[in-house]
Structures are given as structure tokens and as C-alpha cells.
């Protein structure tokens, strides 16, 4: 009973992994998103393409129709290309993280799907244990690029995407739609997760806020 499930709910988050599991899971994801919108619930989606679960063609067949129900779309350049068919004007294969390469794709996604926010993480892979990390968001009027983090050493990348989404959702709710503060919260939360083993981001709100509001020139420290 999706309508009952969404009574009193403010936010619903999905990822591209769930509909990739099976056709039934894809149908249920669509039904959930439709019910969420009927109840005025904000819907966010981390595209999160997984090539072991489905092909790009199948992903686009399923994910593109879902986007009409999504308010906040999260994904890197590969996700946008493989799930939605958008390609940035940036040489991402060489680790380029120039935010300007994403402006065109963000505008195109916003125009086609009517998102409230489009958000992407930008990773610069220097080595397996050393990454640069930042993010970019667009609200249809302004682009915002977060501060850059130098993460060394990386302890565990698992959970980095989920911690980013969680930080973004928290920020958009707590800071009343302030995309700059929300994005800084998301990037800081994810940067901290890279320094923690395991799936869960075992940090406090205070730690995230301190990092988000601190000096952007230093390395991530805990």
C-alpha cells in the first residue's frame, strides 16, 4: 500500500541499483515514485549505474521514464551517460574534473526532466589511495562548485556515494534549500567516509559541519 506508506513522509530516496535488480523491482520503483509524487514527497535519485546488473540500453529504458518523478538527480558523468544518455564536455577518462565540462549536460538534464537540482561528484584519481574530491550542483539558475578535498590516504571508498547523498539530503532539508551549504555538507560527509573502513559513515553532524565550514586548502583529517 504505497499511498499509506507515504503518509506524513517528506523525502524519498532511490538509487539505480534497485530497478536494475529485476523487472519487478523496476516496476515497484516506478510505483513508489508515482505514489511519492501524489503525496507531495520530494524524490531524490542517485543514478548509480552498475554494469554487472544491466546494460546502458536497459538502464536508459527504465531510468529515463523514472526521471519525471525525480526532484534531485545525483550522478557522476558515467551515470549520466549510461543511464540517461547525456555526455559532458570534459575528458573524464583522464581524470579531468573541470566543472565547466558539466554545465552543458546539467542544463540539458534540467531542461528535459525538470529537476529542481542536478548534482554530480567529481573525482580526480591520483592513485588508488589518493584522490581529489569535489562536487557541482545546479538549480536551474546558478551553478555551485564545492571546495576541493585532497583525500590521502583513502581507507575505504565503499559508502562514499551513499554518504554523499545522505549529506546532500540532510543539507537541503536543514538549510532550507540552500544548495551551496547543502553541497558542502554532502562533499564533507563523503570525504570523511573515505577515511573510515566499512559501509557506514561513523561521523557526527558536528564533524561534518566543522569540515564543511573549515579551511578548504588542507587535507581531510580525523
For the regions a language model picked out, list residue spans one by one.
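Ribokinase/PfkB-type carbohydrate-kinase core domain
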Residues: 1-144, 148-152, 177, 201-210, ...
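Short glycine/serine/threonine-biased micro-segments
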Residues: 14, 157-159, 196
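Active-site catalytic microenvironments for nucleophilic, acid-base chemistry
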Residues: 35, 171-175, 192
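Phosphate-handling active-site elements
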Residues: 142-145, 171-185
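Short, small-residue alpha-helix embedded
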Residues: 154-179
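Residues forming the Rossmann-fold NAD(P)(H) cofactor-binding site
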Residues: 166, 184, 188
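Short arginine-rich
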Residues: 190-201
Amino acid at each position: 500500500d504505497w499511498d499509506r506508506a507515504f503518509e506524513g513522509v517528506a523525502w524519498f530516496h532511490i538509487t539505480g541499483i534497485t530497478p536494475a535488480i529485476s523487472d519487478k523491482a523496476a516496476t515497484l520503483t516506478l510505483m513508489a515514485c508515482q505514489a511519492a509524487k501524489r503525496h507531495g514527497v520530494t524524490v531524490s535519485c542517485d543514478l548509480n549505474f552498475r554494469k554487472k546488473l544491466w546494460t546502458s540500453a536497459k538502464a536508459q529504458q527504465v531510468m529515463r521514464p523514472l526521471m519525471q518523478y525525480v526532484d534531485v538527480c545525483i550522478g557522476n558523468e558515467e551515470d549520466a551517460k549510461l543511464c540517461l544518455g547525456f555526455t559532458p564536455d570534459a575528458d573524464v577518462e583522464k581524470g579531468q574534473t573541470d566543472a565547466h565540462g558539466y554545465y552543458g549536460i546539467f542544463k540539458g538534464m534540467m531542461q528535459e526532466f525538470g529537476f529542481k537540482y542536478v548534482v554530480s561528484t567529481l573525482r580526480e584519481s591520483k592513485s588508488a589511495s589518493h584522490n581529489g574530491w569535489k562536487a557541482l550542483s545546479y538549480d536551474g539558475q546558478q551553478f555551485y562548485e564545492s571546495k576541493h578535498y585532497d583525500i590521502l590516504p583513502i581507507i575505504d571508498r565503499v559508502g562514499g556515494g551513499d554518504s554523499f547523498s545522505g549529506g546532500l539530503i540532510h543539507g537541503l532539508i536543514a538549510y532550507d534549500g540552500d544548495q551551496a551549504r547543502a553541497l558542502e555538507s554532502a562533499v564533507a560527509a563523503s570525504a570523511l567516509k573515505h577515511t573510515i573502513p566499512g559501509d557506514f559513515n561513523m561521523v557526527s553532524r558536528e564533524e561534518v559541519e566543522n569540515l564543511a565550514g573549515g579551511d578548504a586548502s588542507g587535507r581531510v583529517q580525523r
